[in-house]
Each structure stands twice: as C-alpha cells, then as structure tokens.
Amino acid sequence: MKKKAVLAEKPSVARDIARVLGCNQKGNGYLEGNGYIITWALGHLVTHADPEHYGKQYKTWKLEELPMLPKRLELVVIKQTAKQFHAVKHVLNRQDVGEVVIATDAGREGELVARWILEKAHVKKPVKRLWISSVTDKAIKDGFKQLKDGKRYETLYAAAAARAEADWYVGINGTRALTTKHNAQLSCGRVQTPTLAILADREEAIRKFVPKPYHTISVETKDGVTFRWADRRSKEERIFDDKRAKTLQEKLQQSAIVIDSVNAKTKRTPPPPLYDLTELQREANKRFGYSAKETLAALQRLYEQHKAVTYPRTDSRYLSSDLVETLKERLHAVDVQPFRKMVANAKKQGLANAKRQMVNDAKVSDHHALIPTEQPQSASAMSDKEAKLYHLIVRRFLANFFPPSESELTSVEATANGELLRAKGERLVSAGWRGQETGEEDEALARLLPAMSKGDKKAVKWVGMTQGKTSPPPRFNEGTLLAAMEKPAQHMEAKDETIKKTLAQAGGIGTVATRADIIEKLFSSFYIEKKGKDLYITSKGKQLLELVPAELKSPALTAEWEQRLEKIVQGKEQKQMFIAEMKEYAKAVVAQVKADTATFRHDNKTGEKCPECGKFLLEVNGKKGKMRVCQDRECGYRKNIAMTTNARCPKCKKKLELRGEGEGQVFACVCGHREKKAQFEQRRKQNKHKNVSKREVQSYMKKQNKQDQFANSALADQLAKLGLKGDDS
C-alpha cells in the first residue's frame, strides 16, 4: 500500500503531527511510520527569481532598463534552505508515496509555501489538504480523519500566487525606478505606500488645525441635580462666543428651572465580540504597549508551542455553529486559576448566551475567532507576554457566556429663562457579564438622578462656566493605525461612495496576517518614527509620497486589488487577467517616475563619513534608537549610535538610552541622568533585584546590531542588498 507524504510548514508542527500519527523513524529531513512520511519546510523554501535571472542587463540597477516585465516569473530554490528543499523533494517523489497531504498553515500564504514547493519539485501526485484551526492532538487526529481534496484549494493558491507576482511587478519596478532616479534608498508598495499616506494625511490635519476656545455652562439645583446648557436648535453644548457665554451665565442665574420631559429607557450592552487578530493587536498595544509584530509573534508561540489558542491570523470575531459542541471542553480546559471562579459562573449559565453572542456562520470564512483550545494550560510555562495575551483571549471568551448588562438611562430636558438644559443619569439594573472579572474596561456610569416629573420646578444653586479648546485629531499609535488600515474609509475625505464601499467590502488595506509587517517596514525604511507611543512621519516619508504616483497612495486602489484577489479565490476571476493589468500598471508607475521633475533631498546628512565608501552618513531614528546609515544605495553600511534599552533610570525610572561606542558608551535619560556603562554595570551587580545584567546588556546590543532578516521573496532579496524592506503583501 502506498504511503502518504505530509508537508508541514515548520519543524515544530511536523514533530506534533508525527507524534500524533506515530511516526517515530527518523530520516534525513523527515519522520516516518504507520504509512506516513512527515517532512517540513522552513517557511518559504522557494521564491521568485531575482531580476538578473531574466537578463544580465538587470544585474545593475539602471533607470533606462525599466520596466522589467518577464513573460512568466520563474521559481528558484532559496540558497540558505536548499538542503531542506532537496530533502523535501526526495520525500515527495519517493516511489512508495502515492499521495501528498499539505499541512502548512491553513491560509493563503501557507497554501503558497506548499504549492511552490510542489511545483518546483515537479510533484504530480494526488493532493489532500489538512485544514485545521489549532494544532492540539485532538485537532490533528480529527483533521486527518476528514482530509479535504486539494483541488478545493487551487483557487486559493492562484490568489496567493497572483498577490506575489503583483508585488514583484509593481514593487520591484517601482522601487528600482525611485531608487535609481533619486540615488536614495526608496521603496514603494501597494500596501506600504497607502498606509504611509494615511499617516501623512493625519500629520497634515494636525499641522493645519487651529484650536478654537469655547465655554460650557453647568447649572446645579439645590437638590443636587446638574444640568448642562445646550443650544435649542443644534443641541451643541459648546459656546464659541465669549460674550454670549457670559450673557447666558447671568441669564441662567436669575431663573427657575421647569422640567419639560423625563424619558427613561433600558440599555442592553452585550459583552464585546471575540478577538480577531487586529482587535487583539490593538488591545495589546493599548494595554501593554506591544507592537503589532510583538503580539503576532507571541500569539504564534501560543498557537504552535503551547497549543493554547486557535489559529491567530483570523479576521473573524465569531464562531461557526459546528464549534458549539466543543465549548464545554474548552471551558474545562481553562478551569484553572485565575479563571476558576468565572468558569464556575459560566457553567451555571449554560450555552444559551454563548450561542447567541458567539456563533454566526455568515461571519466566518476560512477561520473563526481567536479562542482557547481544549488543551489545559499552565501560565507558568508561558512568558509574561504570552500569559497576558492568553488571559485577554480567555477572559473575552468567558465573558460571552454571560448575558448582556442592563442599565436604565434617564434623560431630562428642562427650560430656564427660555434656555434648554439637559441632564442624564444611568442606573445599573443587571450587571450581566460586567459582574464578572472579565478584565474589560467598564464604561463609567453617570450619576443617578432623583425622581422627577414633567412640570416640576427646581431652584438654581449655582451656575458654573468651564473654558476649553477644540483639540486636533490625535496622532496615530500602532493600535489606531491598525484600525485605520482595517477601515481606511473613515480616514478619507473622498466623497465617492463607490470607493468607500470598495474599501469596506475588501476589509481595508493589507490583511490581518500582513499589517504588522507593513508597519515594521515603514519603521525599517525610516519613513516613520515613534515618540513615546505616537507615530510621526519622517522627512524621508513625506518626500517619498511626493515622488510616487498619486494612484499608488490611494487606499482605494489596493483595496480594489484585494477584492479582485478574493474573486480569484472564489473562482470569479482569472489570475492571468489580473496579472496582465498589474504589468500595465507597473509600466505606468515607471513612466511617471521617469517623467517626474521632483527631486529628493537628504536633510539628515551628518559630518561623519562612511568607513566603507567615504560618503557622508545619514542620521535616522530607528524603532529602537538612533542609527547612522550610508546614503549610497549600493553600500548599505549602518551602525547604531543610540538605542533605547530595558534598563531603568535610578532617578525617574524611565528607560535609559545607550549612546556612543566602545569604552565611551554612556547610559542617558531624558531627565538628565547620565552614567558610564562601566558604572551602570557596577550598580547592577550591587543591586540584584534589578532586571538587567551585563550579559543582558551585551545580548541586547548584539540583537540591535543584527539586521532584520527579510521575507523569502525576490523583492525582499533585492531590497536586502540595499538595507531596505519590501512590501510583500
């Protein structure tokens, strides 16, 4: 009987599958037993060929050689992981293998990882698909009992390949055109560039904002009710005319208050929906300051290593109905401290609330919301970051077993000397889910109002006036930028409802799986920088937006592309038609860059020369500190000159910055505290209760000096040679 070759995305997942299936015999890059051979990729083992593969003229970056539009993009084996590719190829093509099971991540990119390997290895055997939302033993066993036909996912592969090819044609051509035209390390991409444009638009709105002073008026009665004045026609509470505000204050002081209406209604507030990836990234950024990338990395460990949560790269906040039968088992798995009391209360509620609030088949596509698995966990085995995220997921899950909270809202309108006064009160009737230790932030309940009826009269105790100023739009942080990428129409001035509809249907720009990487690329390309939690666009970022074609800056364009990729998944559009249009668009981008008369100017040039090529270095703010990088795109030299560490200032407890090189390195704080590195290390030895040791400082420095590894794509490989990051999604 022929054996089944199973292709996993990573060694850790392959080991889990092998253990569950009883594959104990070790081979070269595989595990075998019970009729299965489990092998694994290391992420992408195959990628698109570099431009020079299609002609020697493309080896050197020259504007006149653009655009590069190979008729067909060819696949090549990635050199660094070629050994594993050949091991996988050998397994897949063994004569005793009759069927291949794709067990890579259940999503578009996971499909691409596997299918590119199968294509490059010339595998022509029948394909089955393991499609599971968690990697617990139970999920793996159940998944292998109901393997899907691989043909069912061929359109998913077509969409993934179309996305990668579009990024090659548009990204590489646009990046080479900008870089060679302006002799600067510039890159553009169909997701990266519109995301940068969203930040730039907010920056411009803040710059143009002119604050306006205003007053609000409060009136307190002798029985303790506080009313607020409002314009009778517009209902606006702010008064922008100083003279009018003073006149109103005097007018209200000389009047009695007559109640015009008292309205009471019940407000039902359900628990917040379960987490999808974006919502969890936003919450983790807001609560703990984690970057989107940090959250995704910790989630991936919770999913793969701990088997604690379901598939993380999901865009759904609901469960499918077939998961209802697993809810009791999941409750049992989280019946440990600190959730035990909440679990006991949840069990008393039964499943009625959970079904009503969590289950919605229409809002689940490939993957359901993030929830705990059926496998019991120990928080002690998790890192601090992992435990915090796990707690958020579990508490949100448990909250949905409880009914909505109920409160009574009372709104009162009154007249005083012809002016409208309003008061609001809120009384909690039933706590529902709010009565549990969910960890959610409760809305502050308004003060209670005494009983009142229409026609009641009240005496004025005092009339107060408060002054304020209108505020500019807030700066983006990583959490709010993720939200803007998900719903960019809310941040556009465009009145075209068709564009807004397209953005809504496409689910924004980028995907839940790629948005964190896009933000990281904006940092590593020095287009944005962080001050505190706020994001600022750099001079380089602003100039880039002046140099790229206007259409590439529009969120609508990339959203339209995402829609078309989804149509390819659904079988409603052909990949070839989409790619033909991407080639034409790449041509147009190059033509516009060539014709543009604008210039790029380095305004961060230092007096220090590059030790490798002699040109002056540029000073930039990286995500974790200041760096100096060579302005020459072919040199790529860079060094850290100041980096934010985890060490704390002994005076104000803020994070210290490590500056300088060699023996002259100094720790400095914004409060003015400074100490040499040697003194810092000596102080650490004397105080063992602190967290940073000499070894940790040195380890941290080494990590900071390592350049980030680029994604396995031809575009990324090209940009890596320049010290740039590509937009591969």
UniProtKB/Swiss-Prot annotation:
Q: Which cofactor does it need?
A: Mg(2+)
Cellular component terms per the entry's GO annotation: cytoplasmic replication fork
- Report which superkingdom the organism of origin falls in: Bacteria
Disulfide bond residue pairs: none
Q: Which reaction does it catalyse?
A: ATP-independent breakage of single-stranded DNA, followed by passage and rejoining
Q: Report which residue ranges the record marks as coiled coil.
A: none
Occurrences of domain Toprim (ranges) = 3-136
Residue ranges annotated for the Topo IA-type catalytic domain, each copy included:
153-590
User: For the site Interaction with DNA, which positions are given?
Assistant: W61, W168, R176, R313
GO BP field: DNA recombination; DNA repair; DNA topological change
Q: What is its EC number?
A: 5.6.2.1
InterPro entries referenced in this protein's UniProt entry, alphabetically: Topo_IA (IPR000380), Topo_IA_2 (IPR003601), Topo_IA_AS (IPR023406), Topo_IA_cen (IPR013497), Topo_IA_cen_sub1 (IPR013824), Topo_IA_cen_sub2 (IPR013825), Topo_IA_cen_sub3 (IPR013826), Topo_IA_core_domain (IPR023405)
Keyword Metal-binding present in the record's keywords: the answer is: yes
Protein function: Releases the supercoiling and torsional tension of DNA, which is introduced during the DNA replication and transcription, by transiently cleaving and rejoining one strand of the DNA duplex. Introduces a single-strand break via transesterification at a target site in duplex DNA. The scissile phosphodiester is attacked by the catalytic tyrosine of the enzyme, resulting in the formation of a DNA-(5'-phosphotyrosyl)-enzyme intermediate and the expulsion of a 3'-OH DNA strand. The free DNA strand then undergoes passage around the unbroken strand, thus removing DNA supercoils.
Q: Which family does it belong to?
A: Belongs to the type IA topoisomerase family.
The name under which this protein is listed is DNA topoisomerase 3
Organism the protein comes from? Shouchella clausii (strain KSM-K16) (Alkalihalobacillus clausii)
Gene behind this protein = topB
